[in-house]
Amino acid sequence: MTALEVADWRRQVFAVYSAVRDATDLPAAHDLWRRERDRLFAEHPSTPLLPEDRADFTGLKVRPYDPDWRFEVVVQPVETRRMEVETGTDGIVPFDLIGIVDIPGVGQLDVWRLASYGGGLFIPIKDALAGKPGGTYGGGRYLIDTVKGADLGAGAEPASLVLDFNFAYNPSCAYDPAWACPLAQPGNTVAVEIPVGERYSGSH
């Protein structure tokens, strides 16, 4: 893939999330998100699918929308610390912990800021279904990765975010081991099962 192809992928992802943020019909917005991601995975030169997986690709395994898994949460400040992730393609990528969020029935999640060019917020999630057959990706999923467009916006309260687990998705390394992705650490691992969002079958 070329730099221009990657830029086009990002541009389209940003556009999808912009449409989701503007939507008032959340199930319809979720369906748009699912369909557009299916299209990108199937057709785009920057798809993370391996060549041998593309011919049989019929769509990502995404659960139906459940409004009970949408939250607006206030980011509570904490003492900062740094996490450095070896990505292979981009070298060591630094993240700074900027806060935590408390999610009813789920638990606490760390909120990270990308501490390099572009900045951005990053919230991965690893739940009790991770690594189980028919469950979620063993390394966890992403809720928010704003530098790459995955951003559901701010909540109504100051310093708050919209976290909607229906939009949790697998990182690229779930589909192509050539990618090295930041994965959920202990502060982004919860003991409950999160049945919505994208599932994982080992290929697509």
Feature names for model-found ranges:
Residues 128-130, 150, 168-171:
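Short Gly/Pro-enriched loop/turn and capping motifs at secondary-structure junctions
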